[in-house]
Amino acid sequence: MAASVRKARSLLGLTATLAPGSRGYRAPPPPRREPGPWWPDPEDLLTHRWQLGPRYAAKQFARYGAASGVAPGSLWPSPEQLRELEAEEREWYPSLATMQESLRVKHLAEEQKRREREQHIAECMAKMPQMIVNWQQQQRERWEKAQADKERRARLQAEAQELLGYQVNPKSARFQELLQDLEKKERKRLKEEKQRQKQEARAAALAAAAAQDPAASGAPSS
């Protein structure tokens, strides 16, 4: 402990011996401006742009008054600036009547939207029973079509087995080729059947029209 104290004292003594030989540095004070308004040099590159505008002139007038040499009339906004300020005030600070009218229009729009939504829901609910019937009919037709296709394919497979004359694997290439040929003939037969039915229906319609109009079926005029 004593050794550490002596060491600290020796360091302090060394510092004390070095202190008189050192010289402290004191920066000079900044130059004082003359009392009164100060106007920056427009030609100086270090001059801020805002110091050359009306904002700086207004600050000088606010600090020094008439001694600043600023005409009070020049601090008022121009007619164009005044119109811009009024438009900005109307946009960001609307009057009470304007806000009330805006709220009224907003509430009317929301009420109209709510009524339209309720009307749309009511119309959809009124159509719901018929939509359910249509959906059930579509499901039934889809099921009937699937059953008919299944029966048709089973019949064609039976015909293919009969034509081959022996049991064959339905997945074999020969069986699939024969099945495709039978399906093609079946589609052709159905198409011809539809065309025949259309022709018969057209002929029946023409015959009915001729029976209702005796003049049309009579002999040609001389």
Curated annotation (Swiss-Prot):
Residues 14-40, 188-222 are annotated as: Disordered. Belongs to the mitochondrion-specific ribosomal protein mL64 family. Residues 144-213 form a coiled coil. It is found in: Mitochondrion; Nucleus. A motif (Nuclear localization signal) lies at residues 184-200. Component of the mitochondrial ribosome large subunit (39S) which comprises a 16S rRNA and about 50 distinct proteins. Interacts with GADD45A, GADD45B and GADD45G. Interacts with NR4A1 via the NR4A1 AB domain. Interacts with ATAD3A and ATAD3B. GO terms for cellular component: mitochondrion; nucleus; ribonucleoprotein complex; ribosome. It comes from the Eukaryota. This is Large ribosomal subunit protein mL64. The gene is GADD45GIP1.
